[in-house]
Regions:
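N-terminal glutamine amidotransferase
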Residues: 1-193
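Conserved small/polar residues in nucleotide/adenosyl-binding loops
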Residues: 196-198
């Protein structure tokens, strides 16, 4: 099971976070293990927005192992140091939850491959999205729970896709939740309903 929803506002912006939450909540009977949003927000396009995690939500139903929260701070310090070493500057930093962060980064690059590989080589760290307008937010629980946890009802943008998941092929964790960032491309996200064999 699982469910996918998407919306596009042509030539205008709207409250895509709230709208997609309503659509995904209507699909909760298709799966409530995790829910993910790929939101394309209104930005000035100057800085990269990087959503990443330094740990897993180990709430009810999670297949992840509990970690000491202090390890999240250590991982964040290494991420910050790596970003600085690559000549980038963290312009804005938000820590939504102990394991979930959002950075705006001033970084002159067209190739995100080396950047993302260096960040993701840090044990326990995963980039959920990177781009000038894309933000992938995903976590355990149904659409309303995730929307409330991350205040997505305030996000204004032009389009969005989302996924309500019932885990059948992998664990109940953030890493396995959809949508996925189209690594290493800026502002690309994908969601699907089945296994993809390459």
């Amino acid at each position: 099971m699982c469910g996918i929803a998407g919306l596009i506002h042509r030539g205008k912006s709207s409250n895509v976070g709230s709208e997609l939450q309503g659509m995904l909540q209507a699909l909760k009977h298709r799966g409530e293990d995790s829910t993910g949003y790929a939101l394309y927000g209104d930005t000035d396009g100057k800085n990269f927005i990087m959503r990443f995690k330094v740990g897993e939500n180990v709430g009810e139903g999670s297949s992840s192992v509990m970690e000491d929260v202090s390890v999240y701070d250590e991982r964040k310090k290494i991420v910050d140091q790596t970003i600085t070493e690559m000549g980038a500057k963290i312009v804005k930093e938000e820590r939504t939850l102990p394991y979930s962060l959002r950075y705006e980064i001033d970084f002159e690059t067209k190739d995100l491959l080396d950047f993302s590989q260096r960040i993701e080589s840090i044990p326990g760290v995963e980039i959920l999205s990177m781009g000038k307008s894309l933000e992938v937010i995903k976590d355990l629980g149904n659409a309303k729970m995730v929307c409330d946890r991350y205040s997505l009802d305030k996000l204004v943008g032009t389009h969005a896709i989302g996924h309500a998941r019932m885990a059948t092929e992998s664990g109940v964790d953030i890493k396995s939740a959809h949508p996925f960032w189209g690594y290493p491309f800026s502002d690309v996200s994908v969601v699907h309903l089945s296994l993809i064999h390459i």
